[in-house]
Design a protein with these regions (language model features):
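Beta-strand-centric surfaces of beta-sandwich/beta-rich domains
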Residues: 35-411
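Accessible peptide chain termini
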Residues: 1-3, 36
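Low-acidity, Ser/Thr- and Arg-rich intrinsically disordered low-complexity segments
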Residues: 3-6, 10-13, 17-21, 26-30
Length: 411
């Protein structure tokens, strides 16, 4: 366990840098110390950095300061008078419209993103968190480095929010979505919200906190996140979380939204990571699905009456924050809100980034177990892969914007 939150943040920032030179030069540039058996950089962002001077320039973008201008925030008047919360949010975003949340120039780094929005616009529009698509573009690129439904990006798949208490992603009651992944850019950044919901979004609140920099070191990598979904996985075929990545980088996290389509225990499948030319067999694998997400023995807990249940949890680097048999934003006077069992998990490789030099592929087996032993399963899986890499990156194979509403819709 890390001895302070600053050490956790320091480790997170270390994942942004790749190491391509000799050990001697690495020692000079990182000036690392050993803390609790882990290598930490002294000069990363954290509590220890607060005592040092810097040439970075603090900025933020939100509805009150859409350009992030110095001395240009909170200028709009309200019924209370000038500069009194005149533009707290974006209003009435039509279905099908794209909104540029941030269009930044020069070099810098996004340090924090906060967002909130309703999870349902009406009884006929319940899946807002799957139908708003968040995309990020770095350094003038034409294909996004981040393309993920809003809820899934913040570990809230199934179009329903849950409480998440981790280092890079935190979600607090009533859909307060927070992201602390460092997002550096060498020459500009553009963040776009795409409304593919079937109805207008009445109000969307957001803030993007960042710093302007004179320049960034050449070895700083950019942040990527990719969403995939199979409504029914193929029997005996591993589900692909990530592939088609070429270049040098670090794999830093997985989010999984799982809907069980069969009974019995679902979580015997192994996460497998193929690195740098691996073909038939991976270099890295887990011993089971719940093991990968930090649990064990089927997350088993007991109710007061002695019945088994799966115990949820949310920690700094791994969690099982969501488990439900009902989704409360889809009730109707004509049917109940019962669903197949839905679960959400995350695993952050921050103390232990999976480093690749040329390519990476990440997969998940769908294997269950019953009274007769292991068996191949078919379930509904959606996932987000998070990684840093050198640009340019390959276009994502499953484009979220090209999926239909049914392909995004939770069970």
């Amino acid at each position: 366990m890390l001895s302070s939150n600053s050490e956790a943040v320091s480790t997170l920032n270390m994942a942004v840098r790749y190491k391509s030179r000799g050990e001697e030069q690495r020692a000079r540039t990182r000036k690392a110390t050993i803390i609790m058996g882990m290598t930490m950089p002294n000069n990363a962002n954290g509590l220890e950095a607060l005592t040092r001077t810097t040439t970075d320039r603090t900025r933020c973008v939100n509805a009150e300061n859409p350009q992030g201008g110095k001395g240009r925030a909170a200028m709009t008047a309200s019924q209370l008078g000038p500069s009194r919360k005149g533009t707290p949010c974006l209003k009435n975003i039509p279905s099908g419209q794209d909104v540029i949340l941030a269009d930044l120039s020069g070099a810098g780094e996004i340090r924090h993103i906060w967002m909130t929005v309703t999870d349902a616009t009406s009884p006929t529009g319940p899946n807002v968190l799957r139908n708003l698509i968040l995309e990020c573009y770095w350094d003038g690129e034409q294909t996004p480095s981040v393309s993920v439904p809003l809820g899934d990006f913040f570990c809230c798949g199934h179009a329903q929010a849950c409480r998440v208490e981790s280092v890079p992603v935190a979600v607090y009651p009533r859909r307060g979505f927070n992201c602390f992944w460092p997002m550096p850019f060498h020459n500009g950044a553009r963040i776009v919200l795409r409304n593919r919901h079937n109805e207008p979004i009445e109000a969307f609140f957001y803030q993007i906190d960042y710093v302007e920099k004179d320049e960034l070191p050449e070895d700083v990598m950019t942040f990527h996140a990719q969403w995939r979904r199979q409504r029914v996985t193929e029997l005996g075929q591993d589900y692909v979380i990530l592939d088609g990545v070429h270049g040098r980088g670090s794999y830093v996290g997985t989010y999984l939204a799982l809907t069980a389509l069969e009974s019995r225990w679902w979580g015997e499948g192994e996460i497998k990571v193929y690195l740098d030319g691996d073909k038939d067999y991976p270099t890295w694998c887990s011993t089971g699905s719940e093991d990968y997400f930090g649990g064990a023995w089927s997350f088993a807990g007991q109710d007061p009456d002695g019945r088994m249940h799966e115990a949820t949890y949310s920690g700094a680097y791994m969690g099982f924050p969501f488990h439900s048999r009902q989704l409360d934003n889809r009730e109707s006077q004509y049917w109940d809100a019962d669903t197949p069992v839905t679960r959400g998990f995350y695993r952050w490789h921050i103390p232990d980034p999976i480093i690749f030099a040329s390519d990476i592929k990440v997969t998940l087996q769908q294997i269950g177990v019953d009274e007769q032993g292991y068996f191949e399963r078919q379930d509904d899986l959606a996932s987000v892969a998070y990684w840093y890499q050198q640009e340019p990156h390959q276009p994502f194979p499953q484009k979220v914007l090209e999926t239909g509403e049914r392909d995004r819709r939770p069970r």
